[in-house]
Amino acid sequence: MPNDQLNTSSPVRQRVRLIIRISQNALSFAVGDPTAPLQVDYEPYPVRNGISIAANLREAFKQSELLNKKYNRALVLIDSPVLLVPISEFDESEKETIYHHTFSGMEGNAILQQILPDQNAVALFSINKDLKTVIEDHFDNIRFIHLVQPVWNYLQLHSFNGVRQKLYCYFHDKKLEVFTFEKKRFRFCNSFDADHSHDAVYYILYVWKQLGLDVQHDEIYLVGEIPEIEWMTEALHHYVKKVFKLNNRFSGLQINKIASNPLTVNMPFDIQTLYINEK
């Protein structure tokens, strides 16, 4: 993407938005071309073990090719435990109390909120305060969202196709997000640690049973970094007739990967859906 020579104060540069994706053990960055929205530079950053994500991000601002180009605007995707509250029941003054009551070990984090108008909910999630400070030191205009939010938005639109119930299973960062929609609301949404495919199958079928879905007519959709996809699909087919894998790569998206290691991971589905949702 030919933006290396753009001045940070130029109108074109000011329209450029940097995406920062932060999970427990991974960092990556993406920038779309403002003149060609589906052309994206993507840089996975090698995280050092033994130091915090905040410390890794400080180093990245010195070493990353994309971060060194300087930006005014940043959209930060945060992977942390998320609590979904119906908009009609949300009281901002109580968000810290209900979040800490639901999730332990988050006392040193800042609690963030994001209204999800399409799902009629408010997402509460958290970010380490040191990490938040590192980000705020580098950008004038920052927006924080939960990492899975663009996937929710994209797959909610997908759920309107046909009349059958659809259970979505998004795999990322050794986690499994399981969710389904009913009209314009979440019917179910939860996250599981899923290092192993056998555990993932158990969680999916457990949720399926709890929701009382129809094994002959309702549908399971798998997407993301799916472990042992062939085995998992076959295992699910023993219990559910309709199991599908969604494509991880959108045909219209042109990705220029910036990385010293050619074998490094591909752009995550959640970042891709950000650009596709805005198309």
Regions found by a protein language model. Name each.
Residues 1-279:
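Hydrophobic/aromatic-enriched cytosolic interaction surfaces used to assemble or bind macromolecules
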